[in-house]
A protein has these predicted regions:
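Solvent-exposed coil/turn segments that connect beta secondary-structure elements
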Residues: 49, 58-61, 68, 83-86, ...
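Non-catalytic, structured segments within soluble enzyme domains
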Residues: 125-274
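N-terminal post-signal-peptidase region of extra-cytosolic proteins
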Residues: 38-41, 71-80, 94, 156-157
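Coil-to-alpha-helix initiation sites in intrinsically disordered, low-complexity, charged segments
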Residues: 11-12, 148
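Flexible, acidic/glycine-enriched loop-and-adjacent beta/alpha segments
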Residues: 47, 79-131, 186-191, 196, ...
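Short Gly/Pro-enriched turn/cap motifs at secondary-structure boundaries
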Residues: 43-45, 123, 151
Length: 274
């Protein structure tokens, strides 16, 4: 009896995977060298610049805000202790459920993503550390077809390097300050102020879930954001329902607050650049 033929699609995938694995092995030393001098957390935080400059009177009180960076809207760096724990938990649940356990790469999630890709349903498996590496290094920015094999390898190497030099708290803090949330809003300070008129420490559970849901697709349509928010709320066993999240999202995404007004608000001093 003749053996059953191997499906062409499976064989093609196996061949591509073997080639990618070979490239990964050959390029690993280069990727490691490229990220040996990755910046310290203190350097990244010190280099952070708000997109708004605040003019003060002779008594040190804010008078006027001028935008100095037209590419993004970004407020002052927000320490992790000033970010609502409910938001931190929602982001970890949405983006990296084993954040506290892995060393930069979640191999379990990566294996699951590979299986789904073979089945024709691709999904991401990037950890918060990997995403942060992509935000810190312009060379890791994905192209129109996503990241190349070499970029993915370098991203893995960079994430592992970050985990060796930074604490988990520093990784989470930097990610929340650098990640794009919606349109030109970058970082949790601008996102909380621009969408909800709040400081990050004042976010409630519904707002936290909505912001976490935005991270996977900052410019996704409102109905997509609502669906992701509903799924995340169910995952977290949250006290808020889908109808509430849908209404909250529609309102926040349609009517964005004026960041200049937020920065000048006397009850929001933590948003002023140091």
């Amino acid at each position: 009896m003749l053996p059953e033929p191997v499906p062409v699609v499976a064989a093609g995938w196996c061949g591509r995977l073997r080639r990618q694995q070979l490239v990964a092995v050959l390029m690993l030393p280069l990727a490691s060298l490229a990220h040996a001098a990755f910046p310290d957390f203190s350097q990244v935080r010190a280099a952070h610049r708000p997109s708004e400059a605040v003019w003060l009177d002779r008594h040190g009180q804010p008078l006027q805000v001028s935008r100095i960076d037209r590419s993004v809207r970004r407020l002052a760096w927000v320490p992790l202790r000033q970010i609502a724990p409910v938001l931190q938990g929602a982001v970890i649940a949405s983006e990296d459920q084993r954040f506290a356990e892995h060393s930069g790469v979640d191999w379990q999630a990566a294996a699951g993503a590979l299986v789904e890709r073979l089945q024709g349903s691709p999904r991401g498996a990037s950890t918060l550390s990997m995403q942060l590496a992509g935000l810190l290094d312009a060379d890791l920015k994905p192209g129109s077809d996503g990241r190349s094999v070499l970029q993915k390898l370098a991203q893995v190497s960079a994430a592992r390097g970050l985990e060796q030099r930074w604490s988990k708290a520093q990784i989470l803090e930097a990610y929340l300050n650098l990640a794009p949330f919606r349109g030109e809003l970058q970082g949790i300070g601008a996102a909380a102020a621009g969408l909800f008129g709040k400081q990050p420490h004042g976010l409630n559970q519904g707002e936290a879930i909505l912001l976490a849901a935005l991270l996977r697709g900052p410019n996704a349509a409102a109905d997509v954001v609502a669906r992701r928010s509903c799924e995340l709320a169910a995952q977290l066993k949250a006290r808020v329902g889908c109808a509430y999240l849908q209404g909250l999202g529609a309102q926040a995404l349609a009517a964005r607050s004026n960041l200049a007004d937020i920065v000048l608000a006397p009850e929001l001093p933590a948003l002023l650049p140091l």
